[in-house]
Regions:
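Extracytoplasmic small-molecule ligand-binding "clamshell" domains
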Residues: 35-105, 109-110
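Short loop->beta-strand "edge-of-pocket" segments that line small-molecule binding or catalytic clefts
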Residues: 36-50, 57, 134-152, 242
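Short beta-strand-to-loop elements that line the ligand-binding cleft
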Residues: 74-82, 148, 164-175, 209-210
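A ligand-binding cleft/hinge motif common to bilobed small-molecule-binding domains
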Residues: 99-109, 185-214
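A conserved helix-loop-strand patch within extracytoplasmic ligand-binding domains
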Residues: 116-160
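Extended ligand-binding regions for polar small-molecule ligands
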Residues: 58-70, 131, 142, 152, ...
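Short helices/loops that flank or line small-molecule/ion binding pockets
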Residues: 79, 84-96, 112, 173-192, ...
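Periplasmic-binding protein-like
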Residues: 42-46, 120-123, 199-238
């Protein structure tokens, strides 16, 4: 009888120890893997993402932070001067992703594009004095000298469509320098970015004409290398983006005051 009483707790302890060993072997690595910090490139692209007074700002940044909080995902922001630098860092695995961005073939080679967090409207901007310019005309495409931020998606699109592209700067604010000095006839960038730069640089909006060219999804890129280590990240991310939109709708529907 005493032998049986002794064996029972020993057996119970062995079972618990075995369960703990199995958890350490299979569950713990998965739990640790899920906590791998996301190193995210954030281009200087007002009003979506930018740095001001040493802090991160922009509604693209705020949306990203909200989505990561929903996922309970740790992240580290890596500020980038432009999209070209951000994509290179993603290609060399210096960062694990990029936000916010529109989709293109080059980025799709090394990363996966999420559901849309927002939409961006690529817009032509030109001096209002230039009444001869019609961006939707054949002559504009054939003759107008245009520009966009170097290696940005608008720049790559203009090159692919065989526009006469010149003087593409790394700094998006320099586009207006090119335009105001009449070194180019028109520039292309998102409408909200154009308005944000005008405000930051104290430019008079009444001096410019604007015309929407196209509207595209603005989302989050996660590198394929990171996904290989964390295969559940994209479905979870897309679900979190959907919940983010639902929360925004609920917030917008609430009466103010």
């Amino acid at each position: 009888m005493l032998c049986c009483l002794i064996k029972t707790p020993i057996k119970s302890c062995c079972v618990k120890a075995l369960r703990f060993f199995i958890w350490c072997c299979f569950c713990l690595p998965a739990a640790l893997q899920a906590k791998e910090t996301l190193r995210m490139a954030m281009p200087d692209y007002p009003p979506y993402t930018y740095i001001q007074n040493g802090g991160y700002h922009g509604f693209g940044y705020e949306a990203f932070v909200s989505i990561m909080a929903d996922l309970q995902q740790d992240f580290k922001i890596v500020p980038e001067p432009n999209y070209g630098r951000a994509v290179k860092d993603m290609q060399s695995q210096v960062v694990d992703g990029l936000f916010l961005a529109s989709e293109n073939e080059e980025r799709n080679k090394v990363a996966v594009f999420s559901a849309a967090v927002a939409y961006t409207g690529w817009t032509w901007v030109w001096l209002k004095q230039r009444t001869d310019l019609k961006p939707d005309s054949i002559s504009f495409k054939q003759d107008a000298v245009v520009s966009a931020q170097l290696n940005s998606n608008p720049y790559l699109w203009l090159m692919k469509q065989h526009y006469k592209v010149a003087g593409a700067p790394n700094n998006i604010r320099m586009l207006f320098t090119l335009l105001n000095s009449r070194r180019v006839d028109a520039i292309m960038l998102p409408e909200l970015t154009a308005k944000a730069v005008m405000q930051q640089e104290k430019l008079d909006p009444s001096l410019y004409s604007m015309q929407l060219e196209m509207q595209l999804p603005f989302g989050i890129y996660i590198s394929k290398a990171y996904i290989a280590r964390n295969p559940d990240i994209m479905p979870k991310l897309n679900q979190a983006i959907m919940r983010y939109h639902e929360q925004q709708k609920e917030f917008a529907s609430k009466p103010s005051g």
